[in-house]
Amino acid sequence: MANCIDLKISAALIERLNVARVLCFGDSNTWGTVPDQAGRYGINARWPALLNDALTDVDVIEEGQQGRTIIHNHSFEGHKSGQRYLKDCLERDSPDLVLILLGTNDLKERFSLSADAVAKGAAGLAEKTQQFKRASMNKSIKVLLIAPPAVYEVGCYAKMYAGAHAKSLQLAKYYALYAKNIGCAFFDAGSVVTPCPQEGIHWQIDQHQFLAAALVPIIRDMLGKSG
């Protein structure tokens, strides 16, 4: 009897190990920061969790960090570089597909980066992900490079993001260009998401729903899944 139970458990574990894994790698809008508050949306309200609910045959892994940038570190917030941390995530989680949604923090006035430079950095991160290999993985990782939506220079973030609005409106164009150059899938989050108009950076709860709904069919197509 014990052997039968053990076999059933082993079979279930093997089946689960064969499920496609999707890594959502982003910043505070992946982490779930609530606009104009110190709080965080509940785990079931954030867009990665909504993807996990909709994609029942996929394991969605949430990897968001407040203040995360593409390459540069904040002078007083420690190591927030996505480039520095992503490799550890790839080794730990062994994803089949990685969704990269970064670039908003790189628009901060202190970094003095153009929209072109931000997009080029994001594409560089995507390309390194495509090229990542480890012994236990016999195929390349697929990547969906997502351009963040526009930001607004309002409220408490106005000074920090001085000059960022105009740059943010150009991100999708450059992200699409560089994604095409490296043979990477692309999506413009700004086509479905708008940040809180009073706060300018973070998303209200319905925007998480809009993004998840838009990404579900794209993910299914990229993973070769139907229905």
Residue ranges of model-derived segments:
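Serine-esterase "nucleophile elbow" of acetyl-processing enzymes
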Residues: A2-Q65, N73-H74, D88-L90, Q209-F210
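Alpha-helical cap/lid subdomain in secreted, periplasmic
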Residues: C4-D6, S10-L17, A49, H79-G227
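Active-site beta-alpha loop architecture of Rossmann-like, nucleotide-cofactor-dependent enzymes
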Residues: G32, T69, N105
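Short secondary-structure boundary/hinge segments and terminal tails
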Residues: T69-I71, C196-P197
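Structural motif
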Residues: I70-S81
